[in-house]
Amino acid sequence: IQSTSMDQGSLSEDSMNSFIRTLIQAGIWKNKVPRQMTRTQDGIQTIVKKTEDEPDATASKDISLGFQPIVSMDAELLRQQRRFSSPRVLLSENTPLEPPPLYLMEEPMVLNRTSRRKRFAEGKSHRGEYSVCDSESRWVTDKSSAVDIRGHQVTVLGEIRMGPS
């Protein structure tokens, strides 16, 4: 929804109604509560949810004040929308198929940093399913060996001596 003025505080009811109508037509309005068409003060038809807890006056007042109901969106609808797709991140409910790249040498464009080249889609892309919730941040104190950023096995020193020895 676009606004014509930057200092305009709220959206017009027409634009909000067309947005809600678009959501309903797209089939993503996932509330199980029966809906009823009512008229606001301006005579514009809006959708009001009827529940046993709230009277009709409260629901129509909320809509006229600009409160929006919570909308649950389908994952397939997000995949169809171009603005939600990213070359680096894929939203998925499944676990990742492969681990993320460990170092920059896997990227073909990083090998020659001195020349400026245009990016092409033919290069190896790391778009895939990466987990963003499985990492754990804590100090590891019982490691004796590790893998450095170049992939070489190294020994972890328990104590570092500085100065003349």
UniProtKB/Swiss-Prot annotation:
SUPFAM superfamilies per UniProt: Cystine-knot cytokines
Protein's GO biological process: cell surface receptor protein tyrosine kinase signaling pathway; modulation of chemical synaptic transmission; negative regulation of neuron apoptotic process; nerve development; nerve growth factor signaling pathway; neuron projection morphogenesis
Disulfide bonds: none
Keyword Signal (UniProt): yes
Main subcellular location of this protein, as a coarse class: secreted
GO CC entries: axon; dendrite; extracellular space; synaptic vesicle
Gene Ontology MF terms: growth factor activity; nerve growth factor receptor binding
Alphabetized UniProt keyword annotations: Cleavage on pair of basic residues, Glycoprotein, Growth factor, Secreted, Signal
Chain positions listed as propeptide in the UniProt record: 4-119
Intracellular or extracellular location(s): Secreted
Superkingdom of source: Eukaryota
Similarity comment: family membership: Belongs to the NGF-beta family.
Function: Seems to promote the survival of visceral and proprioceptive sensory neurons.
Name used for this protein in its record: Neurotrophin-3
Source organism (scientific name): Anilius scytale
The gene coding this protein: NTF3
